[in-house]
Amino acid sequence: MEHVGMDLGKKESQIANLTEAGELIEKRMRTERDRLVAYFKDRPKAKILIEASTISEWVARLLEELGHVVVVADPNYAPMYAQRSRRVKTDKRDARALAEACRLGAYRPAHRTSDEKEVAFRGAWRGALAATR
């Protein structure tokens, strides 16, 4: 199985892919649904590690729909996998560190909301908002 680290950004994301043969493939792309689908749909199934952020949940769900195993890591525990090689912080280094942490299992998963809980939360939020009008 391949191991992928993704450093997500609102506009652009950096991807580091460690293949089964040990090759490192790096790619920078716009963080857009169609571009992510185009890149990941034909790739071998992979374990993908991304840090929790405002956009991590929709990216994780999209990649899971494509058949990949996605882990959203708790960024509060980033020193576990990212501090060793970080003299200057760059997206490329972060993606590489995430890919290596994915391969080694050196991360702490973040809590993820299920679809049902998300729908229930939105319904309750809308109800509370409507009650204030």
Where are these regions (language model features)?
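Phosphate- and other anionic-substrate recognition elements at nucleic-acid/protein interfaces
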Residues: 1-133
